[in-house]
């Protein structure tokens, strides 16, 4: 007889399908700093990220005890407050302050293709959540470079304000801005805090962003750094603050997106301010970044899959289940995930494109 073309073997077929992977938590803070450390251990590479996670590795920034450069105190103040990884990129001090600033901004070596200064932070193997360069970010030119880089890697940026009066600081704040330029993720700090230096045997003033970076790293990415008590023993410029008075200098600075250090009933000097230079809550920026980073990582494995209805439904359910864990631990008050009702179309699917809406508040 001829072959039966529709014949099927009367047996058993076992198909095993793994359930979608759990997406996990949002992750912790990781800091990236650029600055100088002229007495750093020769084994630490220059213009390359070096990971510091303890006072032992921090000591390599200055084995001589002279505490020279901008990175020594900045990293020390962070580690005093919270134990998080701090990646530092050490640049050489130039012949002039302007040369040093250029080294901090960095770029790409035209001969070797090596990334220098700020650009070197792009090769950090962990996801940076906070970046800065205490002592160098008090001008619009440098602030713009850090804002742009922060936008690209989805990290918040802590900037030095001008060493100026409140009125002049407000004028400077009006020069900065533009959410599409990355300034919505920039926290600008007004006055310089003083901390004790063993080398100087007295208090020394640090750049405004130094202690603010520590305050931002101390809390979760979706929490406000405002009202955090710092280790400041004094400030370069006293800012008038009264929680009941809306006419104070402090209130004026905050209304223009500038944070500052002032004495409060909590004792000592606290960081006051919780908005970026554009007025957006810096904690909300942190939440957006954290969720975005998690979705990018979780979506990597799904990029090669066919866009079938069951696949898309499964991915939507997976993200929605994960979002509900954020609701359960009170990271967000609520949220839902669904396919965009208008942007998704047959032509988009044919092109491998689909849109998922993550609605949270």
Kindly give the residue locations of the regions a language model identified.
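Hydrophobic alpha-helical scaffolding
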Residues: 65, 277, 281, 305, ...
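N-terminal assembly/attachment segments of tailed bacteriophage virion structural proteins
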Residues: 45-93
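C-terminal edge-of-domain segments
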Residues: 343-361
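Well-ordered mid-protein domain cores that form the structural environment of catalytic cofactors
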Residues: 84-114
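A glycine- and small-residue-enriched flexible loop/hinge signal that marks low-structured segments
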Residues: 2-21, 25-56, 104-301, 336, ...
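Extended, compositionally biased non-globular segments
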Residues: 290-343
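Hydrophobic, Leu/Ile/Phe/Ala-enriched alpha-helical segments that form helix-helix packing faces
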Residues: 75-79, 120-122, 146-150, 319-327
């Amino acid at each position: 007889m001829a072959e039966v073309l529709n014949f099927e073997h009367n047996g058993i077929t076992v198909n095993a399908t793994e359930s979608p992977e759990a997406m996990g938590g949002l992750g912790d803070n990781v800091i990236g700093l650029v600055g100088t450390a002229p007495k750093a251990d020769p084994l630490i590479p220059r213009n390359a990220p070096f990971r510091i996670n303890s006072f032992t590795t921090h000591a390599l920034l200055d084995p001589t005890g002279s505490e020279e450069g901008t990175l020594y105190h900045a990293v020390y103040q962070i580690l005093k407050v919270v134990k998080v990884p701090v990646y530092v990129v050490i640049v050489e001090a130039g012949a002039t302050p302007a040369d040093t600033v250029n080294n901090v901004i960095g770029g790409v070596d035209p001969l070797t293709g090596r990334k220098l200064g700020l650009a070197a932070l792009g090769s950090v193997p962990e996801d940076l959540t906070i970046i800065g360069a205490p002592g160098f970010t008090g001008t619009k030119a440098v602030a713009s470079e850090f804002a742009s880089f922060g936008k690209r890697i989805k990290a918040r940026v802590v900037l030095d304000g001008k060493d100026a009066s409140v009125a002049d600081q407000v004028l400077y704040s009006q020069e900065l801005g533009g959410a599409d330029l990355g300034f919505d993720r920039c926290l600008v700090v007004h006055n310089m805090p003083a901390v004790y230096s063993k080398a100087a045997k007295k208090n020394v003033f640090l750049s405004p962003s130094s202690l603010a970076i520590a305050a931002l790293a101390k809390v979760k990415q979706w929490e406000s750094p405002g009202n955090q008590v710092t280790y400041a023993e004094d400030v370069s410029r006293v800012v008038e603050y009264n929680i009941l008075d809306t006419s104070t200098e402090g209130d004026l600075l905050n209304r223009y997106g500038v944070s500052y250090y002032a004495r409060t009933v909590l004792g000592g000097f606290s960081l006051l301010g919780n908005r970026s230079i554009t007025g957006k809550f810096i904690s909300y920026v942190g939440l957006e970044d954290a969720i975005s980073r998690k979705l990018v990582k979780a979506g990597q494995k799904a990029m090669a899959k066919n866009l079938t209805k069951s696949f898309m439904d499964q991915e939507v359910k997976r993200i929605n289940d994960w979002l509900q864990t954020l609701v359960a631990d009170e990271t967000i008050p609520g949220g839902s995930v669904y396919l965009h009702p208008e942007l998704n179309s047959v032509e988009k699917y044919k092109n491998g494109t689909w849109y998922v809406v993550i609605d949270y508040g």
